[in-house]
Amino acid sequence: MISYASTTRSITVIVRPIYLDEPSDLLGREFAFGYAISIENTGSAEVQLLQRRWIIQEANGSRQDLTGDGNLRPHPVIPPGETHVHNESCTIESFNGTVKGNYLVQRADGEQFRVSVPPFPLHAAAN
């Protein structure tokens, strides 16, 4: 499985996307994808994930802009040297697309900043 990674201010985000045969419906133009996400804190202060934003661009020109908690309830705290892992999914109407985005995080001192999610492709039947 191919991984995509980016680091912002000592927070590394690694994404591993996969096409999901089930529940995809080729005739109904519904293509489902899952992605495992690892968020590693290599800094010296703990951070808490507050929000995520996904921008999903489909090959047919359609775009989804999703902002909110997603699968981040309760809001995970990641101590220095630790990694938080969770899964997300989406359904698109095209065979192909791309996803990019960011996480809003907060340090223990209250400082908030955005951590980039590496852009990654969605390719139907690419498994």
Feature roles, as predicted:
Residues 3, 91-127:
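Terminal connector regions
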Residues 39-43:
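Asparagine-centered strand-capping/turn motif at beta-strand->loop junctions
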